[in-house]
Amino acid sequence: MLYYALVFLIVAIIAGVLGFGGIAGASAGIAQVLFFLFLIFLVISLVAGLIRRT
Protein backbone atom coordinates (compact mmCIF):
# COMPACT_ATOMS: atom_id res chain seq x y z
CA MET A 1 0.00 0.00 0.00
CA LEU A 2 2.88 2.34 0.75
CA TYR A 3 4.29 1.55 -2.69
CA TYR A 4 1.13 2.84 -4.39
CA ALA A 5 1.13 5.96 -2.23
CA LEU A 6 4.69 6.73 -3.32
CA VAL A 7 3.89 6.06 -6.97
CA PHE A 8 0.88 8.40 -6.84
CA LEU A 9 2.99 11.03 -5.06
CA ILE A 10 5.61 10.91 -7.81
CA VAL A 11 2.94 11.07 -10.53
CA ALA A 12 1.29 14.03 -8.78
CA ILE A 13 4.61 15.88 -8.53
CA ILE A 14 5.34 15.30 -12.22
CA ALA A 15 1.81 16.40 -13.18
CA GLY A 16 2.18 19.52 -11.04
CA VAL A 17 5.50 20.45 -12.61
CA LEU A 18 4.14 19.96 -16.12
CA GLY A 19 0.82 21.61 -15.31
CA PHE A 20 2.29 24.78 -13.85
CA GLY A 21 4.98 24.99 -16.51
CA GLY A 22 4.66 26.13 -20.08
CA ILE A 23 4.26 22.59 -21.34
CA ALA A 24 0.55 22.49 -20.44
CA GLY A 25 -0.45 25.01 -23.09
CA ALA A 26 1.48 23.22 -25.80
CA SER A 27 0.07 19.86 -24.74
CA ALA A 28 -3.47 21.21 -24.79
CA GLY A 29 -2.95 22.56 -28.30
CA ILE A 30 -1.60 19.24 -29.53
CA ALA A 31 -4.47 17.37 -27.85
CA GLN A 32 -7.01 19.66 -29.51
CA VAL A 33 -5.49 19.08 -32.96
CA LEU A 34 -5.43 15.31 -32.41
CA PHE A 35 -9.05 15.35 -31.22
CA PHE A 36 -10.29 17.03 -34.37
CA LEU A 37 -8.06 14.86 -36.56
CA PHE A 38 -9.48 11.65 -35.10
CA LEU A 39 -12.99 13.10 -35.24
CA ILE A 40 -12.53 13.59 -38.99
CA PHE A 41 -11.21 10.02 -39.29
CA LEU A 42 -14.31 8.78 -37.44
CA VAL A 43 -16.66 10.58 -39.82
CA ILE A 44 -14.75 9.28 -42.87
CA SER A 45 -14.86 5.75 -41.48
CA LEU A 46 -18.61 5.95 -40.82
CA VAL A 47 -19.33 7.30 -44.30
CA ALA A 48 -17.12 4.65 -45.91
CA GLY A 49 -18.92 1.94 -43.93
CA LEU A 50 -22.32 3.21 -45.04
CA ILE A 51 -21.24 3.41 -48.67
CA ARG A 52 -19.77 -0.09 -48.57
CA ARG A 53 -23.05 -1.55 -47.20
CA THR A 54 -25.22 -0.20 -49.98
Curated annotation (Swiss-Prot):
Similarity comment: Belongs to the UPF0391 family.
HAMAP family: UPF0391
Keywords, ordered alphabetically: Cell membrane, Membrane, Transmembrane, Transmembrane helix
Record protein name field: UPF0391 membrane protein R00741
Topology in membrane: Multi-pass membrane protein
Pfam families in UniProt: DUF1328
CC annotations in GO: plasma membrane
InterPro entries found in the cross-reference section: DUF1328
Transmembrane segments: 5-25, 30-50
NCBIfam families in the record: PRK13682.1-1 (NF010226), PRK13682.1-3 (NF010228), PRK13682.1-4 (NF010229)
Localization per Swiss-Prot or TrEMBL: Cell membrane
